[in-house]
Amino acid sequence: MNDLKILNIKVNGINIFEDKLNVNFYCKDKVVDDNSVKNVYGTIYTNNIISIVGLNAVGKTTLLKIINLILQIIVNGRGINDVFNDISLLPEKFDYEVVFFFDDKFYKVHSYVQKYYEKSELKIEFIEEFIHSTNKSSISSKAKLNEFIETQLNGDNAEITRSKLPNISKLILKREDSIIGIITKDNTSFCRNMLDSVNLNYLYIKNNSPREILNLFDDNIEYLRKNSDDIADLSLKFKNSDEVYENKPLLFWNNILSSGTIKGNSMAFSCIPILKTGGYLIVDEIENHLNKQLIRVFIDIFCDNEINKNGATLIFTSHYPELLDFLDRADNIFVLTRNEGNKTNTKLLSDLIERNDIKKSDVILSNALKGTAPSYESIQSFKKFIANEVLYGKHGF
């Protein structure tokens, strides 16, 4: 299997973040066992779980969308305009750097991107790109990898430069396509995202849903079958009823089945091909519709190296720090906070805490890191406003 492993992503120029975004996929801390990690080469491992936590409106979903954008380009080989419909989130110009391992080599790509108009439609294009590679034998330690990540890549040390491609290649290459496809065209892994399921949680199944999947989320379902290519042409039977539901509109299925069953079914079907190929599954607000213990099942699957043999990665955001207690490591948890200038800081939990014997959820919920929980003052001010409005109704609610 020729699967690509992302090691580091840097993005420069995203306005809501204070500094250049730096997202590590590799394990910065010592690896003592191989659960929840995948060996890439030498002492370099990648995390099978990456979590993003923080208060409401701090930038978790924005960060997840940016990660998805990069993975869709690098891993899936898609054009930038095919995968990013929130162009308003992006500045007029920005650049990103990605370090990854593929085909027994370490690669670094640095891409410069800008907005442009085509027939009054706002789009994005690549204006310059550089690619450099090195044999795996030259990077067998985290120190060497970090040196490779931090090395400035430009036209002087690049092996491939977009603007210097042969004219025939420039004619074939679309403005929205990265030159990285030259390298990664044989990659067997892929990225799938569930970003839209936060607000649009609709039932969609390709084949009959196995009872083993359905009964984890609703043990009263006897079967759920797909009868044709029509997404709403299903048959459903519950164990406690003789009635069989068939030939119903799509909205009916979303009403008769619980939101948790629908999301759980979707996540399960998304997980399987990702686990097979060592790819990436991106889930926003993973706790939506699902019991905490059900989320743990998915986390455990990605952490179990007997199931996740190819080092697939689950990347998720959450408002619930309690989920972090299911994770063995802290170098895979990104904590987002706002500074006094209302810019978002992104830091690894492992860089913020010194002790490993404290529950991760306690650290976040106690606001010990400042900015990970509502302040005492804001809570008291809110309560006082509500109390005054209930008693005196000054604002006419």
List PLM regions with ranges:
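Phosphate-coordinating catalytic segments in nucleotide- and nucleic-acid-processing enzymes
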Residues: 1-24, 73-272, 276, 366-371, ...
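Switch/communication elements of ASCE P-loop NTPase nucleotide-binding domains
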Residues: 1-72, 244-374
